[in-house]
Amino acid sequence: MLTERQLLILQTIIDDFIGSAQPVGSRTLAKKDEITFSSATIRNEMADLEELGFIEKTHSSSGRIPSEKGYRFYVDHLLAPQRLSAEEIVQIKDLFAERIFEAEKVAQQSAQILSELTNYTAIVLGPKLSTNKLKNVQIIPLGRKTAVAIIVTDTGHVQSKTITVPESVDLSDLEKMVNILNEKLFGVPMVELHNKIVKEVVTVLHKYVHNYDSAMKILDGTFQVPLSEKIYFGGKANMLAQPEFHDIQKVRSLLEMIDNEAEFYDILRKKQVGIQVNIGRENSSMAMEDCSLISATYSVGEEQLGTIAILGPTRMHYARVITLLQLFTKHFTEGLNGLYKSK
């Protein structure tokens, strides 16, 4: 159990190191207004904190830096909520006020804004497409044998792909087919499309479309849509601006992981409800052992739809990042609940 004096010194060391990226010595602490102890007392308390594993020495300085254990204690016990500026709050509210009818655009824009507000890398796992409902289908001819099939969902998700159009299918059949699909499938959840097509759409197509077999090939190509979530990044290169990552060899594996994206998809998909903070080696990937990942989930009702996360050095502005994530997920969840209730 740490004493009040040790708690104050530990918090001051971590706050100072987060801001400066420089090891903190007893002389630096003695100049702080909140530290009223003698230099000898400060040195003794720092020695005790080091022995307890909360701070550690560096090779290049006589000062101390927080250990992973120190950061974990700081996050769990010493953090105080940080106030955002009025301009920042307005910027966030404007995002959700303008585009909440298109959830994926909000997710994409959220990643960009969060990266700008934190100077870290922001990652947003978009809403699950499986929870979306079909809003519109379009099949637009590109030439004699190809067309682009466009699927739009109720959350603004747009999925497009190029499909092959058999020569036996004319524009009249294509138009009839699109009209039937929109009439029969509007408002149907994406996960139920296949059953709906088999039970109802196929019969109608057989009745009204001349080249039925060819129409079915187009149908198969149009609705081969992945139902997995999309992942959006903001500030992928921001880690390079951090002093800890000026050594390219040290950060290479992390940059490769960020560029690949797939690992983060797996990590964020497993996140539990609420705010989670993973520090250093608490992360599942060795490439992230010098990083902290703070994540928060957003939802509709009791259903978790996605995750917003910030990746930065262990020397992260934890209070600010957590406050931002709480505000983003609050507005995202409120907006999505309003969006789904209005349907």
From Swiss-Prot:
GO terms, molecular function: DNA binding
Keywords in alphabetical order: Repressor, Stress response, Transcription, Transcription regulation
Alphabetical GO biological process terms: negative regulation of DNA-templated transcription
Physiological role: Negative regulator of class I heat shock genes (grpE-dnaK-dnaJ and groELS operons). Prevents heat-shock induction of these operons.
Family stated for the protein in its record: Belongs to the HrcA family.
UniProt cross-references to HAMAP family, sorted A to Z: HrcA
Protein name in the entry: Heat-inducible transcription repressor HrcA
Organism listed in the record: Bacillus cytotoxicus (strain DSM 22905 / CIP 110041 / 391-98 / NVH 391-98)
